[in-house]
Amino acid sequence: MVLNYIWVAFFMIAFVIAIIKLIFMGDVEVFPAIMNSTFDSSKTAFEISLGLTGVLSLWLGIMKIGEKGGVVNAMARVLSPVFNKLFPELPKGHPVYGNIFMNIAANMLGLDNAATPLGLKAMEGLQELNPKKDTASNAMIMFLVLNTSGLTLIPVSIMVYRAQMGAAQPTDIFIPILIATFVSTLAGIIVTSLFQRINLLQPVLLATLGGMSAAVAAIIWGFSRLDSTMMNLVGTTTANVLLLTIIISFILAGVRKRINVYDAFVEGAKEGFSTAVRIIPYLVAVLVGIGVFRASGAMDWLINGVTWLVSLTGCNADWVGALPTALMKPLSGSGARGMMVDAMNTYGADSFVGRLSCIFQGSTDTTFYILAVYFGSVGIAKTRHAVACGLLSDLAGIIAAIAICYLFFG
């Protein structure tokens, strides 16, 4: 519903500004520019979707091997001690833990198609344990914040889009996204724990979160000591080594499980074409709306206005061009994806803005959409502190993304 209002606003604002330019500024080119943008944006959306098919099939095939090879189950077992502490009101050993673990693990591996059904199943289990059926329980809120923080180990779709948009090294945003999404998740856990009075100083939580924080701090410290050329080289090399290691690990997991690895890959790869075709209408709608908004000059006015405000503080304003992606992400995944593609198309995939928009896309998730779907599926009307915790997690991810992008690419 929110995306509907935003999409209509793109056209209405563009039309009003175009009228003002035509009548008061004598700009006779603005309406032809807007109409040309609709054709160009439609063509761009289709070409992007068509180009996605091959790479998307590759990664969906790899993911299917990991799924059938038991990687998701293995990650669930590793996460078990931590989640027992984050969900103290749930009985130990309750079946709902299985769906919670599977959902989080599937999200971390980028298995969106598997994650959503598992998440809805987990919500049903949590609702059974919920004493107030119209009010979100603490466990529900913690579960949703972990989802909205967008913790992902393999940002497949973003790397695919970067490859399609002509990035020299599509994987160069891999480590920055890992760091930003970790910060977002950590912030979400801390804020939600404060609301729910969960003691984060428990040995298991302290060791896990502290260890991960120390690792991220070490990565940031190490990269901060490198010059920009060496940082890009080390970051890209490390990212590609990690990604290939993950692929090999998935294949070995499949071999160990004695599944037909080739057939599993083909089964997953078949989904690549249908997925690419399925996103065409969404991408056309969003890119045309953004194209009209940009061609009218409204986007320039917005960005220049924010840039001016930021410049008054004396801060660098290079990041402002990627701001539309950050603002759209909590509202709509497809809308933010369109903003990201538009930023790469306008500024270049390897530009600072292009890279930052990708990090924004990967650092958080669609908070309002997730809250609506998950709470709606079990009839929750009173969400308590879920929205506040989700948005604070998003804000932390956005701030971290900006800082990390300056560190790696500034």
Kindly label every feature range from the protein language model.
Residues N36-F39, F46, P95-Y97, K132-M140, ...:
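Hydrophobic alpha-helical segments, principally membrane-spanning helices and signal/leader peptides
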Residues F101, A105, M140, M231-V234, ...:
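Generic signal for short, ordered secondary-structure residues
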Residues Y5, A33, A45, H94, ...:
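Hydrophobic alpha-helical context, especially transmembrane and signal-peptide helices
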Residues E29-E128, K257-T346:
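Membrane-embedded alpha-helical segments and adjacent helix-loop junctions characteristic
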Residues L60, H94-V96, A136-A139, N240, ...:
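Sparse, context-dependent recognition of short Cys/His-centered cofactor- or disulfide-binding micro-motifs
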Residues M1-G54, A163-R294, S311-T313, H385-G410:
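Signature of multi-pass transmembrane helix bundles
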Residues A114-A115, A122-R162, A167-R197, L323-G410:
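C-terminal transmembrane helix pair
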